[in-house]
Regions:
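Non-catalytic scaffold segments within catalytic domains of secreted glycoside hydrolases
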Residues: 1-5, 16-186
């Protein structure tokens, strides 16, 4: 007995929809139903993250988050999860650290899928924001009282030279890219 009141876990999108389409893998749904039921039975609130670095390979093969089609696929996935689990889940996180997904995955290449293309990173940023909004709407249709949000990795932008306008502007640009894109859009 850990004495915890809540447990955050991620649902693996490929475990439920291996090809990223609408063809369900029932064994995946069964697994998460058992997990959620066990948490509820133990008096622990399940808190779900829908995306934490596990895009179905078929979607990545079509350029992943840099392809706008992923927005509809994510919305369909969120709808299916809300329908299957929403009677026991009140707190939903759509995407874990979308900045990392977009920039570290598509611009810097240090995270999957390891791309190094600024334009792909901008597209991925746009599509993760759209996917978050679409998933939020989809969950709210099924679970109107649910709390839905993002997990955002905030970065402290500290300006060492407030009298130097170039430094001030650069700090504002970094804050916009690292933080504001995600927290001010919603």
């Amino acid at each position: 007995d850990l004495g915890v009141s809540a447990y955050r876990f991620s649902i693996a999108w490929p475990r439920l929809f291996p090809k990223g389409d609408t063809v369900r893998e029932e064994r995946g749904f069964d697994f998460y139903n058992r997990l959620i039921d066990a948490l509820v039975a133990a008096g622990i609130e399940p808190m779900v993250t829908l995306y934490h670095w596990d895009l179905p390979q078929a979607l990545e093969d079509k350029c992943g988050w840099a392809n706008r089609d992923v927005v509809k696929a994510f919305e369909d996935y969120a709808t299916a999860c809300a329908q299957a689990f929403g009677d026991r889940i009140s707190t939903w996180i759509t995407i874990n650290e979308p900045w990392c997904v977009s920039w570290l995955g598509y611009s810097n290449g240090v995270h999957a899928p390891g791309k190094k293309d600024f334009n792909l990173a901008v597209a991925a940023s746009h599509h993760t924001a759209l996917a978050h909004a679409a998933a939020t709407r989809a969950i709210k249709v099924v679970c109107p009282d649910a709390t839905v949000g993002l997990t955002v990795n905030m970065n402290n932008i500290h300006n060492e030279s407030p009298e130097d306008q170039d430094v001030v502007d650069f700090a504002a640009l970094n804050d916009s890219n690292l933080n504001r894109w995600w927290i001010d859009a919603f």
